[in-house]
């Protein structure tokens, strides 16, 4: 049985990823800040675990509660209070980076000892086309072309960190996924994709074997070249 941890798993992309991986036979621990929001994940058969990626103690306790870990899905993210340069300030950048980047690294570092014991350790970091310069500059790309400066910058860091972890941990399969413009709370449900479509890349990467890709960036149609 494959044991998986999904962060931000109480709703949206995280909840749908949880549903699909349970259907694929995984035992899924659904990380969320507030266990009171865990009913939907629990009904799917997931095991809710209190996990605030911004709090080291919470992360340590969550990871410490896992018997083993084969797959880590870093999905938790926030937009933050700023969208354009007009209202951009350091605090807005800090809020986005605290959860989307520092929180991801906090979880990864805590989870590495468990992942290293797995016979097929896999990590998927959920990125965004907003953090991928080539997509932002491509008029044919269907990503949301809003500004969201702090969020976009943080997701660029997620993609780069994914490559760095993959280079430094060649025994693991570590990749980033691009959900595309998906209808979630994060964009007030304005996205044109369903959460199922938005989790296609994440789920596919979560299911790869030891000979699968690493250090890559994938959308729902496959690999996106850097």
Residue map of PLM features:
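Hydrophobic positions on the long internal alpha-helix
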Residues: 73, 107-111, 115, 161-162, ...
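N-terminal Rossmann NAD(P)H-binding glycine-rich loop of SDR-like oxidoreductase domains
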Residues: 10, 14-19
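Rossmann-fold cofactor-recognition segment
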Residues: 43-57
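Conserved glycine-rich Rossmann-like NAD(P)H-binding loop of the short-chain dehydrogenase/reductase
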Residues: 24-39
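C-terminal helical subdomain
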Residues: 156-159, 167, 171-172, 176-179, ...
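Catalytic loop of short-chain dehydrogenase/reductase
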Residues: 78, 82, 86-97, 116-167
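Conserved Rossmann-fold cofactor-binding substructure of NAD(P)-dependent oxidoreductases
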Residues: 54-68
């Amino acid at each position: 049985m494959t044991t998986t941890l999904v962060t931000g798993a109480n709703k949206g992309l995280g909840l749908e990823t949880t549903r699909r991986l349970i259907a694929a036979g995984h035992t899924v621990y659904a990380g969320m800040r507030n266990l009171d929001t865990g009913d939907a994940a629990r009904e799917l058969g997931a095991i809710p675990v209190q996990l605030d990626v911004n709090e080291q103690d919470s992360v340590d306790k969550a990871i410490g509660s896992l018997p083993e870990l084969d797959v880590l899905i870093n999905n938790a993210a926030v937009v933050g209070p700023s969208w354009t340069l007009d209202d951009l300030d350091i605090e807005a950048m800090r809020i986005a980076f605290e959860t989307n980047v520092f929180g991801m690294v906090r979880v990864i570092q805590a989870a590495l000892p468990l992942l290293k014991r797995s016979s097929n350790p896999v990590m998927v970091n959920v990125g965004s086309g907003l953090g991928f310069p080539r997509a932002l500059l491509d008029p044919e790309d269907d990503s949301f072309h809003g500004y969201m400066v702090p969020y976009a910058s943080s997701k660029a860091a997620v993609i780069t960190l994914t490559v760095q972890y993959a280079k430094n941990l060649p025994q693991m399969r570590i990749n980033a996924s691009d959900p595309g413009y998906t209808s979630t709370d994060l964009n007030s449900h304005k996205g044109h994709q369903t959460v199922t479509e938005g989790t296609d890349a994440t789920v596919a990467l979560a299911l790869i074997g030891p000979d699968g890709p690493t250090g890559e960036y994938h959308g729902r149609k496959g690999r996106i070249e850097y």
